[in-house]
Every structure is written in C-alpha cells, then in structure tokens.
C-alpha cells in the first residue's frame, strides 16, 4: 500500500517538473524571439500619469503595427504631462473707433456735398409749370367721393335675446317647434287656488300687481316678470302657503327669475328692502331653495311674453300693435282664473289677434297662421275671455299694468279704447 502511494506521488511530482520545464522553455523562446525583457509586475504597482502600461508584443504580431493594433495609439501618445504648457485661447477684438463729430466737421461735410452736386443746364432751363385749370364737378350726379351728410344715424336699440335667436332662419322653425312642445310640460294646475286653505285669487292679484311695480322700479326685463309668476303658480299648485308667506314666495320667485334672465340681477338685500324688511335675507334664501326643489330646478320655461314677441316678428307688426298685444298679455297675469287653463302660445295668439282687431288690421293673416300653426278657431274661446278682460281693465282694483302702459315708451296703448265688438271670420 505504501509503495503504491509512493509511486503515485512520484509520478505526480514528475508531471509537475515536466510542466515547469515546458513553461521555462516557452518563456525562454518568447524572450529569444521577441528580444523583449519582460519586467516582473508587482501586485499593485505605483499609479502615476507617467507610467503607461504597454502590452508586450507577441510573436505572432511582431511585425509593423497596422491601423487595427489596439496599442498603436498608446505607443504614440501619453496622457501625462506634456512638454508644451497649456496656454489660454485668446480672441483678438478690434477696439471700436469712435468718431466725434463737431460743428465744424458737419459744416465742412455739407459744403463738400453741396459742391459735388452739379445741376444740368437742360434741367434748370425748363419752363415753369402752368397752374392747373379748375375742373367743375357735378355733385348732383352722385360722385363716389362725396359724402351725404344729410343721412341721420338711426337710433340704436338694445339687442334682446329673443331677436338674436329668431334672426337665425335655419333654426327658427326648430326652436319654435321645441318650445311648443315644452310649454305642455310642467304646467301649473288651473284650479289650484281651491285647495289653498289660507290664500285667495284676490291675494294673488295683489301679489302680481306688486311684482309689476317691482319690475318697473328695478328696470327688469318683461321676461323676468313672466318667469317669476310662472314659478309662483307652479309652486302654489303643489304647496300650501299661508298668507303671511305669500309675499315671501313672490320675492324669492322674482329673485330666481332675475338671476336666470338678467345680466345684473338685484342683490338679495334689495328683495328684503322691497318687502319693507318684513323678511330677512336668510328667509328669502331658504324660500329660494324650497321653490327650486319643488320645481325640480326646471326654471327654463316658455312664457306668454316669448310667444307674443315671436308672433309679432312673424307678422312684422308695428310698435303700437306689438305694445298693445304685450299689454293684453300682461292683463292675463293678474287673474289666474280663467287663463291658467290655456297654453302660453294660445294666450299670445289671442292677444295679437285682439290687438289687430282693435287697431283695424287684419285679425289673423294667413301667413301668420301658416308659420304659427294656429288658426283663429283654436283660440277663439280665449279671445272672447280676453276681450272681456280688456273691457273691464279700467275698473279692475289692480292698476299697475295700466299705469305701466300709459307711458310713451309703450305708445300709451293702455289708453286705447277696446273695440265695440269682436268681428272676425273664422
């Protein structure tokens, strides 16, 4: 056993000796062929900018170094200190020459320029120009350069919202059709006053008369007044109100309509003031919230005022006829009975027809019947009741609307006497 192990160990040692011999021969051959003394490299040499590691040349690449030799630049360059010191790069800039001009220099320059100018004798010898002859222009023939100062600027009228909408012919018919469908939705109940335990029709008439005065005091649009009364009737159709809170309902409704329609609506403090401080701001705001909740925030409703203005534009009526139809439309606001049972478009058609009859015009032109989709037979009943209201207007307890339309702004149409009878053909 010991011999076997000993012989094995001897063989291993001989193999190692043989390998060492081969390595010595290879090293000697490399040294002899390359004639390069390979320095013994220490584990961690001194790292400086001067010591550049150059790989030893191999026997296979002992020839001239070509462009693909990775050490060719290492042999040529050194990134250490250079013999040439770093010098700053300078750019030469010429200093600007400032020329100081004096009075003498300017005079000399001008004299030299004048001396250089020499006029040709042929130019100076030209005859002088003769004066142009006066040309007579006949202004009566309408010269394009003559302004007609006799034309006076027409009085500029404020542009209202309805006029802008109806001025678009592509959409006017669709808008009218849509509003005719919308007026049937969310209507107030005609007989709601019978279910109110503490208020009556006369109290409502007083409230409407007061709201007409408020709208005139604050110069609110007519549409604002019609919207506010629409909110009141719809609210009272669903809610019972005590007489002490009826004016609060009217003030809050006017406040909502003003914020919807007006550009600069009155502040809530103004509506407290017009009630003679009967209510506080907190109460007006709470009632506003309650009304909007009951109405489901549906405040965009087509009114009698909108349809009346639309029919007047369709018929191309004059200002007197339009003002009279507006006056008749507002008279229907005071009395809930019987006008709540009619659609706003029906009342508007009847008011314009009655205005035409009063002023001696054609009651309902065929062109208007075609555009409005209304015939006289469809609103004849409303026309009869409106005629009775027109006759009884001077004797009505509430006179705010009549006083309003006595103004020259509305051509004093409330002073026009109603016709003796309704004479028209259906």
Swiss-Prot record:
Keywords (A to Z) from UniProt: Cell cycle, Cell division, Cyclin, Mitosis
Q: What CDD domains would the database entry show?
A: CYCLIN_CCNA_rpt1, CYCLIN_CCNA_rpt2
Q: Which domain of life is it from?
A: Eukaryota
Example GO biological process:
cell division
Query: Does this entry carry the keyword Ribosomal protein?
Result: no
**Any Pfam family the entry gives:** Cyclin_N2
MF-aspect GO terms: cyclin-dependent protein serine/threonine kinase regulator activity
Q: Which residues form a coiled coil?
A: none
Is the keyword Ubl conjugation assigned to this protein?
Answer: no
Locate the compositionally biased regions of type Polar residues.
1-11
The record's region (Disordered) falls at 1-22
Give the UniProt family note. Answer: Belongs to the cyclin family. Cyclin AB subfamily.
**Summary of the function given for this chain in its UniProt record:** Essential for the control of the cell cycle at the G2/M (mitosis) transition. Interacts with the CDC2 and CDK2 protein kinases to form MPF. G2/M cyclins accumulate steadily during G2 and are abruptly destroyed at mitosis.
The name on file for this protein is: G2/mitotic-specific cyclin-A
Protein's organism: Patella vulgata (Common limpet)
